[in-house]
């Protein structure tokens, strides 16, 4: 028995020399014979090649995924900065209503929106009912879906607003379905004054803090309130200075989404810097502000003049409101310098004020926008200083008063068409004690309130 050293050479690009000891027999004087059994004489070159190709493919995929991860890191950094910048807004809301801030599941939120879309889509094909109302709800749900998509990576404040809007839409859908079953529909069409007046005011819907911050308590906000305006999607916010008197500028947003995200703002200055000195010739005074047909109407600073500023051309005008009292002579209870309060409704533009002759009683004036003058006035029996605010619907004045830090009451009305007045009691919840401004918009039938720096709105119902 002898030990033989065998050297096998495997012919392949990936092979090497292999040495192995084996038992053999001596054949002759210088030959050692060993028996070697190889299971397969051919090397699997094709399989190795395929493995190499697969390795290259996987390597490329790993590189692609790494690139995607880097891009995601950049996106996450961007949104992290946005969240940090929006933290202040959440903190303000936590101070106001901490019990309302809860974790919201976006998946649940989006699922509810999809259900609403399906529900309204089914209602759109029904032959009866009020198609205008259905289309309005359909468009609002579509807008809400878009807004939730934008808010998913942003602050909780707007998520809660979206949740509240969905709850509100669900309630309106129930009412809408009831209207569909009713023949004929009892819904009062938008723009119509064929009704019996104000019937109900919804709970408050919180939009957000004004763009200047929590220190700016007084101001006004809303949409273009002229009936059937071409600027229905435009929003404006007008916080007064911290003194609660001077309005130096307003901010305009092209859409609700822009307003909620504080995006794409357009600032309209009312105070002018002339020779390094602030000129308040066209500055505003008080929060009795409204936008009507793309024009801002307000009380000129330190005067009984009415001011008008075009939101597009920046042209400023002023006209005296004869005999009107000003400079906080007769403002609303709880808010300063709102001696002159502009309001818009289905009938046009109005101004609410007082005169020496009226002895502090509310006077309603109809504004002729063509001549920028007040053509007709009505003197009521209601003291302005006993009211917290007022608004117009279809030529009828509605006056509110405070019943405490959380409740407001619409308690007085005056019809300019008939000259008749009356008392009523329609409750209106509020989130803070002071109502700094309150205005009506006939295009969406909402009330817009500015209260302690926050923007709120209410849905209203009219008696058919």
Swiss-Prot record:
Signal peptide: 1-16
GO cellular component: extracellular space
GO biological process: sensory perception of smell; signal transduction
UniProt tissue specificity: Expressed exclusively in olfactory neuroepithelium.
Cellular compartments annotated: Secreted, Extracellular space
Oligomeric and partner information: Oligomer; disulfide-linked.
Function statement: May influence the maintenance, growth, or differentiation of chemosensory cilia on the apical dendrites of olfactory neurons. Major component of the extracellular matrix of the olfactory neuroepithelium.
Entry protein name: Olfactomedin
């Amino acid at each position: 028995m002898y030990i033989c050293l065998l050297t096998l050479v495997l012919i392949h690009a990936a092979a090497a020399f292999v040495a192995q000891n084996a038992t053999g027999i001596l054949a002759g004087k210088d030959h050692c014979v060993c028996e070697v059994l190889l299971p397969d004489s051919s090397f699997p070159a094709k399989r190795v090649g395929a493995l190499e190709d697969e390795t290259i493919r996987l390597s490329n995929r790993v590189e692609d995924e790494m690139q995607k991860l880097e891009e995601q890191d950049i996106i996450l950094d961007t949104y992290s900065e946005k969240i940090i910048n929006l933290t202040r807004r959440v903190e303000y809301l936590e101070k106001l209503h901490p019990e309302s801030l809860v974790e919201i599941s976006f998946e649940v939120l989006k699922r509810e929106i999809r259900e609403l879309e399906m529900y309204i889509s089914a209602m759109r094909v029904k032959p009866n009912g009020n198609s205008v109302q259905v289309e309005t709800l359909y468009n609002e749900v579509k807008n809400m879906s878009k807004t939730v998509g934008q808010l998913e990576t942003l602050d909780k404040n707007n998520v809660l607003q979206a949740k509240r809007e969905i709850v509100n839409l669900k309630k309106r859908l129930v009412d809408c379905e009831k209207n569909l079953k009713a023949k004929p529909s009892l819904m009062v069409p938008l723009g119509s004054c064929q009704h019996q007046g104000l019937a109900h005011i919804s709970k408050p819907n919180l939009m957000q803090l004004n763009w200047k911050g929590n220190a700016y308590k007084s101001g006004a906000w809303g949409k273009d309130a002229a009936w059937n305006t071409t600027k229905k999607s435009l929003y404006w916010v007008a916080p007064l200075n911290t003194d609660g008197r001077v309005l130096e500028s307003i901010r305009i947003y092209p859409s609700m989404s822009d307003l909620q995200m504080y995006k794409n703002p357009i600032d309209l200055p009312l105070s002018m810097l002339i020779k390094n000195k602030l000129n308040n010739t066209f500055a505003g005074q008080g929060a009795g502000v409204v936008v009507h047909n793309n024009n801002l109407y307000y009380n000129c600073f330190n005067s009984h003049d009415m001011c008008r500023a075009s939101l597009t051309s920046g042209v400023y005008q002023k006209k005296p409101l004869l005999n009107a009292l000003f400079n906080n002579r007769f403002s609303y209870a709880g808010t300063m310098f709102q001696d002159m309060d502009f309001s818009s409704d289905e009938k046009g533009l109005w101004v609410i004020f007082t005169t020496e002759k009226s002895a502090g009683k509310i006077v309603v004036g109809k504004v002729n926008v063509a001549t920028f003058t007040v053509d007709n006035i009505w003197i009521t029996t209601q003291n302005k200083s006993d009211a917290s605010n007022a608004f117009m619907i279809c030529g009828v004045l509605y006056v509110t008063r405070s019943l405490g830090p959380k409740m407001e009451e619409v308690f007085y009305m005056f019809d300019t068409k008939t000259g008749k007045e009356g008392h009523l009691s329609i409750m209106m919840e509020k989130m803070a004690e002071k109502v700094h401004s309150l205005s009506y918009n006939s295009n969406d039938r909402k009330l817009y309130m500015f209260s302690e720096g926050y923007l709120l709105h209410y849905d209203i119902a009219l008696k058919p």
